[in-house]
Amino acid sequence: MSKKILIIAAHPDDEVLGCFGAVARMVKEGDEAYTLILGEGKTSRDERRSVENKKAELNILNREIEKANSVINIKKIFIEHFPDNRFDSVDLLDIVKAILKVKEEIKPDIIFTHYENDLNIDHQITYQAVVTATRPMEDESVKEIYSFEVL
């Protein structure tokens, strides 16, 4: 029986570096996979941290996300725009709600996400938000959560 997989990554390319090998195999074996990218991925190194200043680069990055995910036949990509390397400036509940919205739409059986003790703050918060969004409830679809590290 095929399963639905949801990759939840803090930044563009974390999904590629973290779990694409495993997910590619699972898709090849008949499972369906989806990706949720939480952060915009560009502004942390910009002096003013302005999304407006990085608009052209962000558009290119979004096309690259689509291209990379199409390589392993990701069915749909969801992109949020939380501030790059500043998830700690966002209420955890806002990140949890973004995850819940996607989770409720696709009802995944399996989630791949960041390792809880990763050094990157966005990765830590992503893990925490995933665990919160998948807490044991009677109608919870997620049966397995796998963590990956991005080195």
Annotated model-derived regions:
Residues 151:
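Carbohydrate-associated surface elements
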Residues 4, 143-146:
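A generic secondary-structure signal marking the coil-to-beta-strand transition
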Residues 98-144:
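Active-site adenylate/phosphate-handling loop in enzymes that bind or generate adenylated species
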Residues 1-106, 135-139:
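Active-site rim/loop-helix segments in enzyme catalytic domains that contact anionic ligands
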